[in-house]
Amino acid sequence: MAAPAPSLISVFSSPQELGASLAQLVAQRAASCLEGDRGRFALGLSGGSLVSMLARDLPAAAAPAGPASFARWTLGFCDERLVPFDHAESTYGLYRTHLLSKLPIPDSQVLTINPALPVEDAAEDYARKLRQALQGDAVPVFDLLILGVGPDGHTCSLFPDHPLLQEREKIVAPISDSPKPPPQRVTLTLPVLNAAQSIIFVATGEGKAAVLKRILEDKEGTLPAALVQPRTGALCWFLDEAAARLLSVPFEKHSTL
């Protein structure tokens, strides 16, 4: 089943239907990129509920392309907690367990932090890996970033009123005072987010409704998620009905049934 063409805001009746359409869209984007001039697909993932959502639906959605296609995928992470990979808070660790065991992406194509390094060094090391893997642009360009948004409006590990929102030189930044535990993390910065070819924000549940109204309807442009405005790429929001319940702005209602 083909995913719906994304509008600015797409609303689904349940997280399950959202996840199925998201997986189809990732697979379609991958196929398009692999047929393009660069012949590769660079995907940036966020953690949280996205892990289980993608683990459930992406392997089947991407399977028709065949195992060989995954050798040309490059997978990165939009932010990461500075914890060992077997820690429950490790975003890579969760994807390794639940998704990467089902997708034959070579380990060399999965870009991770080195959690044994101090946070500043871990950020620099991850930035080097990104530049090496995504060569050809002054700022590394992902073909697709999948982002979440917190009830406070944060995305990645970019939090409201934090100095990292002003970072323009680094492509990956360390953070040692995260308002959410664990405190030490590394995160992509706004210049990298806004260089992406496509960005999908995913939000589900009533707990996200108020902040989505602030971003999408009240246009509170200082919230971190609102600062994600791709320079030339596409931006869309995938929401379930609970997350969208306070919105009166136009959106497209989708169903995979």
Swiss-Prot record:
The keyword Phosphoprotein applies. The keyword ATP-binding does not apply. InterPro entries: 6-phosphogluconolactonase_DevB (IPR005900), Glc/Gal-6P_isomerase (IPR006148), NagB/RpiA_transferase-like (IPR037171), PGLS (IPR039104). Its main location: cytoplasm. GO terms for molecular function: 6-phosphogluconolactonase activity. It is found in: Cytoplasm. This is 6-phosphogluconolactonase. The lineage of its organism: Eukaryota, Metazoa, Chordata, Craniata, Vertebrata.
